[in-house]
Amino acid sequence: MKRYQDNTFVVGNIGTPYTQEVLKTDKDSVTVAEISSFQLETAVHFHPTVSAILNITPDHLNRHHTMENYAAVKESITKNQTKDDFCVLNHEDSWLKAFAPKCPAQVIWFSSKEKLERGYYLVGSKICRNLGNGEEVLMDVDKMQLIGVHNFENVMAAIAIAAAYGVPMETILDTVKHFQAVEHRIEYVATKNGVVYYNDSKGTNPDAAIQAIRAMKWPTVLIGGGYD
């Protein structure tokens, strides 16, 4: 987005609070925001042009108590959207498949396991899309600097979000090819005595830890903590 539009702000749960940047924005600004379930609980008028829910897996149940409650809060990101807006959803997630018919926005699917009639998907190592006018091969995942199927899913979601907003595909794909892992998310640290170290301290639930382990291509030792 920053390559497409200079007046772009990356805010929210990812680091910089939305409230810290909001007074710098105007009607032509773009904000890319990661919104937590805690923040969605109290959001009343939040209306994204393009929203995305990448998955719904057990997390923060000490606050939300049940998966039904947690799913409802996550899905509420779309509550103020209309058919003029878009929502990017993971086709492999059973919660999101059940939610899709109720979603007020236009749904855009992505899948790492299934070739979709409409949406973004993997065929072997190729990221493809079909929006109703035939299959288009976008790129090979081997050209990326990220590893792991879950990262390929994240990239498909990011491509879908940016394309729905109107960013040229050439700009999107060039950005993807040069994008490096963000801090604490399967972030390469160092190689010492033949051992490769990755920092995945953002993986704060069992599913995230499982995805990180699956991304490893060699014998792996996990150093972790927590309650699960």
Named regions from a protein language model:
Residues 5-17:
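Short beta-strand-centered segment that lines the nucleotide-binding/catalytic pocket of NTP-utilizing
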Residues 6-8, 28-29, 82-87, 194-197, ...:
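Short active-site oxyanion
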Residues 9-11, 104-122, 173-177, 187:
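Beta-strand->loop->alpha-helix junctions that form or flank phosphate-binding loops
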Residues 13, 54, 70, 88, ...:
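Residue-level signal for inorganic ion chemistry
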Residues 14-18, 37-39, 94, 181:
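Short acidic loop-to-helix transition motifs that present clustered carboxylates
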Residues 24-113, 121-123, 128, 139-146:
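Flexible active-site lid/hinge loop adjacent to a nucleotide/diphosphate
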Residues 121-139, 182-190:
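Acidic-glycine-rich active-site phosphate/pyrophosphate-binding loop
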Residues 141-228:
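Nucleotide phosphate-binding/pyrophosphate-handling subdomain across enzymes
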